[in-house]
Every structure is written in C-alpha cells, then in structure tokens.
Amino acid sequence: MERFEETMAAFGQGKTDEEEEDPIWIDSDGNVDEAAYCEMLLSRHPMKCIHNQLYDVDGHITDASMNRAIIDDIKVYVHKGLAKKVTNLLDALKIMCSVNEMPIQDDRIHFQNGTYFIDEDRFIPDKEFCINRLPVAYNPEAPKPVRWLKFLDELLYEEDIPTLQEFMGYTMIPTTRAQKMLMVIGNGGEGKSRIGRVLRAVLGDNMNTTSIEKLAKDRFCPADQEGKLLMLDDDMKMSALPDTNVLKAVVTIEDKIDLERKGKQSFQGRLFVRIMGFGNGSLAALYDRSDGFYRRQIALQVKNKDQDRIDDTKLGDKLIEEAEGIALWMLEGLHRLIRNDYKFTISSRTARNMDDIRKSDNNMMEFYESEGYIRFDKSCHATTKRIYGAYVQWCQENVEKPLAEKTFTQQLRKDAEILGITYDKNLDTGGGKKARGYHGINVMVNTENRFL
C-alpha cells in the first residue's frame, strides 16, 4: 500500500503554476476525458481489477488510496462535483483493467523485494502481479530473532512452539489445505496479542482484524476476507456461536464460494484466509456438537504469567524490529508443514487440551466413556428412552446440565457409527411393543424411577 502511494506521488499529474499546457486527458472544453485519464493512469501504474478490487505488482490497492491519487490528479481541473467525478473515474478504471481472476500461487511467497519459490528454496529479485505481497523483505542473512524466541519461550510450552511456527508459516501462502484454525488461550496478561503485532509486521494489509463472531453472523464479513491471508480475532468472545457453518466453510473451502458485499451483487469468489484467535477460553458452539467443528481447531494453552515478571512496554516494537528474522523462522515452519503433508505438529498436551475442550462443550462424550451407566456390547440393545434416562442420571450424579431430549437423540444418531451401534426405529421391547432404539448398547442402571 505504501509503495503504491509513493509511486503515485512520484507521478503526480496535477498542473502546477509553472505549467501552461493541460494534460492529454483534459478535452478541449476543459473536462476530464475519463477513458484518456484511465489509459494514462494504467500506463504509468499497471493495475488489474478482480471482483471490484484493484491490485498492482505490490498487491491489493484500497479504494481509499486510489481515490486520493485521483483527487491529486484532477483537483486543479474539476471545480464542481469533485467527489462524483472521482467515483466515476474509479469505476471506469476498474472496468478498463478488469480480469476474471489472477492465479492463486501457493508455490511461492511474494516478498517486498522479490519472489521466493518454496519447493526450490530459491529467491529471485523479480516481481510479478500478485494478490498478496508481504511488506517484509526476504533476507537470508537476517539475524536470529532472539527477542522473539525468548518471548515465545516465556509464553508457550516448549512442545507447542513448533505448532505456532507452522501455523504462522502457513499464513504466508494462499491455501487452506491444512484445514485448521488456531486458538491461543490464556487467562489474560500473558502477552498473546504481541503475536498479532508481529504477524501484522510480516503480513501487512494481507491480514484482517475482526471477530470470529462477526464472521459467523454478518453475511458481508466473508467477502471482506477475499484476498486476505489471515483473519485475526485478538479478543475472542466467550459466548457460544449459534451457527458454525460459515466458520467451518471458511476454514476448509478449496473451491469458490458465494460472497456478498454491501449494496453489491453477490458473486462467486475464492477465500484462502486462515483464522487465528486469542482469548481467555476456547471457541464454543451453541448447537454444533459435530466432530467437524472441533476437528478444525487447534487450541494452544499458554503458560501462566510469572507474577514476578516485569513487563517491557516496548517489547512489541522490539519484536517488529526482528521481522526479517521472524519471517525466516516462519518459513522454516512452513517447510516443515509441507513436508508433513500439511499436518501440524500437535503435542500430547495440546491433544489432551482439545479432547477436554470437546468434552466440556459436549458432555455426551464423557457419558459415552463413563463406567457403570452404559456398556457397548453387540449382543445387547436398548431403547433411546432408556439411553437418555441413563444419560440424565449420569448428569445428575456428575453435576452436569443434561441436553434436551431432542438434542440428545439427534446427536446420538450422528454418533452411532463412531460408537459402533445401529439405529432401529422398530426395536422389539417385549409384549408386542416397538420403539426407537439401538443395537450394540446395554443400559446398566435402573431408569424407571428416575426418568419417564
């Protein structure tokens, strides 16, 4: 973005007091010739427009930046309706340089000073049109980011640092192949947000900061993530998400998706944004207890803050000074992730943490694993009513809030294959009666007096 504005300033076309001739895009009546102006602009600064968004060799150009450049050019000549003329010129410019799409290149990283080819471990100083150019330079001689590594050692358990390294590297290229989002969880005050500052230094405007809740609820929010490498929620809300479909789709999407911008026709676009969140608790769903919701998450638990630690108020700035070295560190994580076929390094600590999170959000998981209430046995069967009765009894005796009967039965149907049980809507209950139930499960407690 800064490079675009610097270039446009260097090519400023507004007439000065010393100039006598009007530029070629001013017609004989003194009006701006929109076609001629756009041709001039594209000749001095080549651009492409995809889905109403402008890009140059350095990546995305915001409408605000383009508007400022146009105003600087035409303000000497347009004395009425300046804002409308700027809007018309921007619209015309987008039409003239419109293309269907640019290739999504996940085999290379567009650094500020050139192109790095991942598979070849090769850098060239040449630039090409791209959707994502990082503001940080590729410098193989950059010093080791010692402050950053010390910060991570104080923040995370040693075995979890490779996970963060791989995920941060994952955000350097436009792909969702790993199909994961990362949550960094703590009690507050540990310094998690400094990770976001470092990522901003490396990714620049290729990173958006917004909330996961907004992404899930606001139908325009997914379109805001088009062309972005990372969406960061630096203060996750603890309230459970009522709908997780959009979130799950964004994390895993590998094809086009319907996107909508306010006041615009919806369109089919590609998203490759990754999601990272910082919070005091895990991401929870109000209704979604599917394996898919939890399978897409990695949750890293930070260390407790050392009560004797003296916070360095300038640490964020010091970490940013190491951006080139941190970029190499991220690149190392990306190479490892690719070698492992986009499977993240997950410590036993994090695996247990994720299992605990899932069980705490869905107490049916703990009920399945409980002893003395139910037993999985292919020779047995039980009605859904009796299974739910055993579940309610387990909740009462473990101070858990039972799910509603309908919610329980729906989830049990979804879990049946994993549990190795078979649904039967006409289970023989004796005395000529039939009821819904399952083969392969035995209820071990008396539910008659506790549940009707």
What residue spans do the PLM features occupy?
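Feature primarily recognizes SF3-like P-loop helicase cores of small DNA viruses
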Residues: 2-4, 8-50, 76-452
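Short polybasic amphipathic segments
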Residues: 52-59, 115
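Trp- and S/T/G-rich repeat-edge/linker motifs of beta-rich repeat architectures
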Residues: 57, 61-74
